[in-house]
């Protein structure tokens, strides 16, 4: 039903379990990466539903752990943040287009304007019609940004969920 590219930041806690189930269904893995498990999970769900957005939402019911995703299909760019909000993800505007990044400083680097953070559990779709959100998974879990985000992973010039990393 089409092709997609996937970028992933994070770690799954149930990757081995998902991988085993997917292999029993005929999936052949080429890496040991969580990213490949996520891609197969979305692809597997896509066979059952009518849109990639529905497939991503269904996959979120199965994927557990810390993740932010950016998925590119021929017609859409889709950004996803895990329901806990463990990993940051933000939206930017560059000319007439939309960009997504794990840190706001990446937007600065390309001259994009920060728009907002992706909410925990939110699926954001950018296409010819503009920007829209699916919030089915929002508010399902307590908010839990990874403790290492501010002190180890993020650059000091980033802003995550409204807080400057340097002063947090």
Predicted regions and their residues:
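Conserved short alpha-helical segments that host acidic/polar catalytic motifs at enzyme active sites
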Residues: 1-120, 125-168
């Amino acid at each position: 039903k089409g092709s997609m590219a996937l970028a992933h930041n994070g770690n799954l806690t149930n990757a081995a379990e998902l991988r085993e189930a997917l292999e029993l269904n005929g999936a052949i893995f080429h890496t040991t990466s969580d990213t490949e498990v996520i891609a197969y999970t979305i692809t597997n769900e896509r066979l059952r539903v009518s849109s990639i957005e529905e497939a991503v939402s269904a996959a979120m019911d199965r994927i557990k752990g810390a993740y932010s995703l950016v998925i590119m299909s021929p017609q859409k760019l889709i950004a996803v943040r895990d329901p806990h909000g463990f990993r940051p993800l933000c939206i930017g505007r560059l000319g007439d287009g939309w960009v997504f990044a794990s840190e706001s400083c990446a937007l600065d680097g390309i001259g994009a304007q920060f728009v907002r953070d992706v909410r925990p559990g939110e699926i954001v779709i950018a296409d010819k019609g503009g920007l829209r959100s699916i919030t089915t998974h929002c508010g399902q879990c307590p908010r839990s940004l990874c403790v290492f985000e501010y002190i180890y992973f993020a650059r000091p010039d980033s802003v995550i969920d409204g807080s400057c990393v340097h002063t947090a």
